[in-house]
Amino acid sequence: REGRKRQGKMMDEKTIKKIVERVVNEKLGDKLYPGQTVETDEGFTKVKDPSGILKIAQSTVRCEPFEQQGVALKDVTTLEEAPNMGCGIMELNHTSFEWTLTYDEYDIVLDGTLEIEIDGRIVKAGPGEIIFIPKNSHIHFQTPDFTRYVYVTYPADWQ
């Protein structure tokens, strides 16, 4: 059956979504203005303003496995929302992986230690620190423990 019973009435999926979005909004302590929407469809909380401004609650982003054990990521903007720059969250867990960037990338460390190895040298960053990696760099992303960071790419379509 579609929906859930509440005091003898059926609640459809749209009503349930509105209730969930209202609860999430209250939990985040935000006031929505006319035209703003809260979306949770992508598995995390995103506030959209009609101007195109977005706010992503990074703590709600759940990364998905990517290419090898110990590497997970989640893009948090779509090409429709941000056609020029990409953004997402990446997590590394006691791992290293080799990558050649065909784009420019900023990495903003949220938790743990991120190490970028290039030509035998290591650039290390901790929470609150930012690393810039220029296009065409052949590197190893690595961490001695666990790290979670925001990546921002230009151009947006990094894959």
Task: Name the predicted role of every residue range.
Residues 119-135:
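Short acidic-glycine-tyrosine-enriched beta hairpin
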Residues 21-86:
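A short, N-terminal "cap"/entry segment at the start of jelly-roll beta-barrel domains
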Residues 11-25:
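Eukaryotic intrinsically disordered, low-complexity regions enriched in proline/serine/threonine/glycine
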Residues 71-101, 135, 157-158:
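Conserved short histidine dyad/triad with adjacent acidic residue
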Residues 135-158:
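Ligand-binding loop in jelly-roll beta-barrel domains
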Residues 1-10:
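Short, Lys/Arg-enriched N-terminal segments with co-localized hydrophobic residues
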Residues 91-92, 100-116:
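Short, conserved beta-strand element in jelly-roll/cupin
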